[in-house]
Amino acid sequence: MANLKELRSRITSVSSTMQITKAMKMVSASKLSKAQDAITQMRPYSEKLTQLLQDLSATLDDDAGSKYAEEREVKNVLIVAISSNKGLAGAFNTNIIKAVKYKAKNDYKAKNIDIYTVGKKANDILKKEYDIHKNNNEIYDDLSFENASAIAEELMQLFLDEKYDKIVLVYNQFKNAATQIVQHEQFLPIEQFDSEENKQLDYIFEPSKLEIVKDLIPKSLKMQLFKALRDSFASEHGARMTAMHKATENATELRDDLKLSYNKARQASITNEILEIVGGAEALNG
């Protein structure tokens, strides 16, 4: 059994760790509340914008397609891996890295693949195996629509310049604090929709259907990326809060076990001292 001094030291160390994990859990819970509100409020608008684009795209003639919908032979692929700058978030970043590697190995095996990393954690790992087109760590300093739009415009220009024939997003979609779902979304070229139901919709267009679609597509792409970033941001804090909650529970359990061991060791030590005193007294009396 460990001596009393060692047990006291371990109890102090575990208690200190428990205070840190508990504080991190509280901070993440506060940030999660704001991030969850933001993504919850954004989703209806994003979904409606996507639905409107689908409805309008389905009514266009084939020769009126957008330059953002141009289908080319896929030779060069850019994977946008959205992670975080900080760790201690369970499997949040690991799941993104695994998903990127899986897609690169299975879906785009014969293609030239570059990675656009958002967040330090994915960049630190993926740069060892893939060519990193760019790393953006600053977006989380101010996660605004304007800053997300700047990244989206950069990606759109890369596609228009034919630097890449396909651009995909890999990110964690927020479901709840304990559950994040890895998503793999095609960003460019935009997917074409052709349903008879959509073609029968009756809209009045001003100025024209084609002009509206041309203006709507860039806005929709910017919103798609912004939503992915918001989802990832909420997922990060949900994952970290859950991880720190579990870490705090484990630290509490370990501390209680150590205290029990300490009390048993202290009791044994006191008992031995009493026995020694009694034994010494009996020897003197004998």
From Swiss-Prot:
What is the recorded membrane topology of this protein? Answer: Peripheral membrane protein
Localization, per the record, is: Cell inner membrane
Q: Which GO terms describe its biological process?
A: proton motive force-driven plasma membrane ATP synthesis
Superkingdom to which the source organism belongs: Bacteria
Q: Which UniProt keywords apply?
A: ATP synthesis, Cell inner membrane, Cell membrane, CF(1), Hydrogen ion transport, Ion transport, Membrane, Transport
User: What GO cellular component entries does it have?
Assistant: plasma membrane; proton-transporting ATP synthase complex
Primary location class: membrane
Matches recorded under PROSITE patterns: ATPASE_GAMMA
* Family membership: Belongs to the ATPase gamma chain family.
The UniProt function text for this chain reads: Produces ATP from ADP in the presence of a proton gradient across the membrane. The gamma chain is believed to be important in regulating ATPase activity and the flow of protons through the CF(0) complex.
How it assembles, according to the record, is:
F-type ATPases have 2 components, CF(1) - the catalytic core - and CF(0) - the membrane proton channel. CF(1) has five subunits: alpha(3), beta(3), gamma(1), delta(1), epsilon(1). CF(0) has three main subunits: a, b and c.
Protein's UniProt name = ATP synthase gamma chain
